C-alpha cells in the first residue's frame, strides 16, 4: 500500500490519524489477509549500511510512524524494505533480496499471490511494482547494476551484493502518470476520491498483463 500522509492529515492533523487508519486496515484484511507497507531507503546505493530498526523510511511520515512501533515486522531488504502484517508474513519476509526485482523477490510474490495494490491519496505512477514489470519486460532504458554494502542483522553486520535494475543516466526514466491513467476502468483498475485526493486500486496480475501488453507495443509507454 502506497500512501500520502496529507490524505490522513486533511481531516485529523495529528498522528492519531495514522493509528486510526492502520487499525482500520488491519481489521479490513482480517486473519486471512496480508498488509504490506513500503519503507524504502535508498542510502544503501550511496554506501550506507542498512539497519531495519534505525534506517528511516524515505517514502512518508506514515511509514516512519509504523517503523517506530513495528520495526520487527520490517524486512531486511536494504533498498526496498517493507513492513509486513498478516498471514503471508513468513513467506514474504524470507524472500531473496539479492536481486531487487528478480524472480525470487518480494515483488515476484506480489504477482504470484495477486496482491491488491492501493495508492492511498497518491498517483498510480508511485507503484513500485511497475519497476518489476519493467524488469520482466527488459525495457531499454534500464540495466542491472551491482551494489555492495552491509546490512545489520542481530547486532552483526553482513556484507551483501544487491542487483538493482536502475535507469540509464542519459534518459529521464521517471514513470509518468498520463498513460497509466488511460488504463483506468470502473472494474479492475479503479479510481476513487477521498476528500480532496484521489486513490487508486488494482490487482498485480491485471496490472502486469495490461502494462506488459502496452510495453510490447511501445518500450517507453511508462516514461513518455
Regions found by a protein language model. Give the residues of each.
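N-terminal and secondary-structure boundary signal
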Residues: 2-224
Amino acid at each position: 500500500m502506497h500512501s500520502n500522509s496529507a490524505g490522513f492529515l486533511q481531516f485529523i492533523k495529528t498522528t492519531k490519524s495514522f493509528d486510526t487508519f492502520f487499525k482500520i486496515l488491519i481489521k479490513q484484511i482480517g486473519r486471512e489477509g496480508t498488509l504490506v507497507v513500503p519503507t524504502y531507503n535508498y542510502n544503501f546505493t550511496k554506501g550506507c549500511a542498512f539497519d531495519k530498526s534505525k534506517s528511516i523510511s524515505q517514502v512518508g511520515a506514515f511509514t516512519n510512524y509504523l517503523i517506530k512501533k513495528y520495526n520487527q515486522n520490517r524486512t531486511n531488504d536494504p533498498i526496498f524494505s517493507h513492513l509486513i502484517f498478516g498471514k503471508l508474513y513468513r513467506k514474504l519476509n524470507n524472500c531473496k533480496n539479492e536481486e531487487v526485482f528478480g524472480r525470487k523477490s518480494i515483488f515476484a510474490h506480489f504477482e504470484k499471490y495477486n496482491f491488491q495494490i492501493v495508492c492511498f491519496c497518491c498517483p498510480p505512477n508511485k507503484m513500485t511494482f511497475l519497476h518489476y514489470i519493467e524488469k520482466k519486460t527488459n525495457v531499454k532504458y534500464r540495466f542491472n547494476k551491482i551494489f555492495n554494502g552491509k546490512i545489520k542483522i542481530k547486532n552483526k553486520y553482513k556484507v551483501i551484493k544487491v542487483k538493482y535494475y536502475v535507469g540509464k543516466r542519459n534518459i529521464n526514466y521517471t514513470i509518468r502518470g498520463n498513460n497509466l491513467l488511460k488504463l483506468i476502468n470502473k472494474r479492475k483498475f479503479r479510481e476513487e476520491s477521498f476528500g480532496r485526493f484521489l486513490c487508486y486500486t488494482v490487482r498485480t496480475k491485471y496490472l502486469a498483463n495490461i502494462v506488459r501488453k502496452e510495453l510490447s507495443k511501445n518500450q517507453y509507454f511508462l516514461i513518455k
